[in-house]
UniProtKB/Swiss-Prot annotation:
Pathway: Carbohydrate biosynthesis; gluconeogenesis
Catalysed reaction equations from the record: oxaloacetate + GTP = phosphoenolpyruvate + GDP + CO2
pH dependence: Optimum pH is 7.
Record GO biological process: cellular response to glucose stimulus; gluconeogenesis; glycerol biosynthetic process from pyruvate; oxaloacetate metabolic process; propionate catabolic process; response to lipid; response to starvation
Subunit description: Homotetramer.
Record GO cellular component, one term: cytosol
One GO molecular-function entry: GTP binding
Temperature notes for this entry: Optimum temperature is 80 degrees Celsius. Thermostable. Half-life at the optimal temperature is 53 minutes.
Lineage summary: Archaea, Methanobacteriati, Methanobacteriota, Thermococci, Thermococcales
Protein name: Phosphoenolpyruvate carboxykinase [GTP]
Amino acid sequence: MNALERLEKLLDKEQFEKVKAIDNPELHEFLAEWIEWLEPDKVFVCTDSPEDEGYVRWKALYYGEERMLETPNHTVHYDNYYDQARDKANTAILLPGGKKLPYINTKDRDEGLKEIRELMKGIMKGKELFVCFFVLGPKNSIFTIPAVQLTDSAYVAHSEFILYRKGYEEFKRLGRSARFFRFVHSAGELDERKTSKNLDKRRIYIDLEDETVYSVNTQYGGNTIGLKKLAFRLTIKRAVEEGWLSEHMFLMRVNGPHGRKTYFTGAYPSMCGKTSTAMIPWENIVGDDLTFILPVNGIARGANVEKGVFGIIQGVNPEDDPIIWQVLHSPVEIIFSNVLVKDGKPYWNDMGIEIPDEGENHSGKWWRGKKDAEGNEIPPSHKNARFTVSLEHFPNVDMEALENPCGVEVGGMIFGGRDADTWPPVREAFNWEHGVITMGASLESETTAATLGKEGVRAFNPMAILDFMSVHLGDYLRNYLEFGRKLKKTPKIFAVNYFLRENGVWLNHKLDKAVWLKWMELRVHGDVEAIETPIGYIPKYKDLAKLFKDVLNKEYTKEDYERQFKIRVPELLAKIDRIEEIYRKLDNVPEELFKVLEEERQRLLEAREKYGDYISPFALEGE
């Protein structure tokens, strides 16, 4: 029996007709094999119709994975108390012959596939399987990658309808030519709160060879929403093989003089200011997380992989995040996850208003002072609690850029690190190679006391992508360098650091980043000059003073400028030593990396000879 004949036996007539309409034997074989293996009681195939999406939304409520809140279209979902984040220990890239890659949790492919198949055999008995079709990137475009998701979680399917563009018609259009990703997920057995029960058997395995990801015994979005960070591993590999970039970056529009629109991408490790940069109220957002960048006629063009936001809700407050706050209080479709609910209203940590002393949260019935099994006090919401919402509901979204099948020209790329004493607030690279190596490939994030218990530890995180890397870091960087060489017009590269401190005091205010963005926009078009330093170009005082007045209506003093933009030679040299040591331990790193780092070291040493350890920007401007 061929796959279609098997599917005709497995599906009811209506669902079978939906699958049959897609002329792709490879898809049919995949569906037949997994429906037979998972043994669901019922299968629902989603087309692009609003009715099918509505069915999934209803099933999330019907099966108890989501519950309605007071505001229309708002629902809440809870994950198991111990299923609240990406499970790094049980997430592995499957590689043949037990191959290993630096910084990546790998597993022998044959072993991994055998284990996951055993865990998934018959796991959907008594459950409904949803077959959903989506695309990564805008539809019918150079960026489009089709994907099919199998899941028994209506919550996961519902999340994907909010976050991704529907792809059923795209599968029909592409037919046999579709090179599609596959995702197979089961939440496994559920407890009385409808959360995954068998967390000891939680596995997330990424099979690069078949471009398939398996996820089992988990519901948390980062482990289960196939098209997000799971697909990201697949697209990184595809991009390296095909010569484009799949990046952990926001995509935003910065509005320049006389109505000029300039687009920037930005890669920042967590807690480094990525979302707050992308959400500056008077600029425009295209995407907050993942960006594809392709070379088109010698120009780098970027597109948002997604169409929605799966955002961290902790700390969202009306003063610092007016746009997100406004969206979260509108009657638009939103899934809140792992927040506190009292009388149908959601509450979360550090929201800037009074939080009730009791209610329900990810731990079940909650009261202030409640402790978990380990004796830790349980906060009102989990620190990784989320909101899932479509970007179309953001007043500052650039819809035209979001849906443009040609993407937008990338004028600048920003790498955002976090340290108290090394990088200046903003600088521009001398050229593509210098930016890729001394900014992107050298990205570090200084941990705060809250995250690791040790303040001031610098975590190496090149391009903010290390957690999701699926190829050798050397191959990834080689592709980056090559990508720039292919372009007739390379985006300018910038590095930012919002976290400088002196004697324990912050040197910058939260909104100063709005000024750095405007300066970068002017530099992309050559509208202002800059000061050449050993580590790149920095702004001139007069330009920043004008921008602070224009953008923030603030006086900007020469003292502030000097403190922020002095070149800190000892710290910069120590950083080069750290980064070089890391890359020396890896094989297969482009030789160019060491050459560019050495050139920077020599420039710093020469400058120290002339000016000393700490160099005023005014001294360099006078040259």
